[in-house]
A protein has these predicted regions:
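Amphipathic alpha-helical repeat scaffolds of TPR domains
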Residues: 138-152
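A non-transmembrane, solvent-exposed segment enriched in polar/low-complexity residues
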Residues: 1-132
Length: 155
């Protein structure tokens, strides 16, 4: 990733890049001051689909931007550690959904069991998100989820 350009934007900036920096010796950094907590997105110009979301706040935040999204990490503050835990949970459940959906076709009873398994995994994902919001209702994660997440209407 050396020499690649790292882009950062606040979620509220309508897809405008706010800051850019270069990767040198496998590392990059941004510095500045902020008085509020804002959800931000960071990506490389060479691979803009590989985006990491994190909460920018007055603290030192570590973002590990890997070549593959599942290895991306964010840490360094209570809010970002919680955000990473939520993302890890959703990612694990999502991988299980994909694994289950890619199993070879089987008889109708087995297929119905797989559909129920996938439905159960989707419910667990929703529960993870809603529980994170509930446990963090007094901070930006809970407020962000409450504002932006609509729980599915499971049947």
């Amino acid at each position: 990733m050396d020499g690649d350009t790292i882009c950062l934007r606040h979620e509220t900036d309508d897809d405008r890049t706010v800051f850019i920096t270069q990767v040198t010796d496998g590392k990059f950094s941004f510095s500045g001051e902020t008085s509020s907590v804002t959800l931000c997105h960071i990506w490389t110009k060479k691979n803009p689909q590989n985006t990491v979301s994190f909460f920018l706040e007055p603290a030192r935040i570590t973002v590990e931007l890997s070549l593959t999204p599942e290895r991306n990490r964010v840490s360094g503050t209570t809010i970002n550690n919680t955000w990473q835990q939520l993302n890890d949970s959703i990612q694990l459940l999502g991988q299980e959904v994909v694994r289950t959906s890619l199993l070879p076709m089987a008889d109708s009873t087995t297929q119905m069991l797989r559909v129920k398994t996938i439905d159960s995994l989707h419910r667990k994902m929703s529960d993870c998100i809603l529980n994170t919001a509930r446990h963090n209702s007094d901070n930006p994660i809970g407020q962000y989820i409450k504002k932006n997440y609509k729980a599915p209407e499971f049947k």
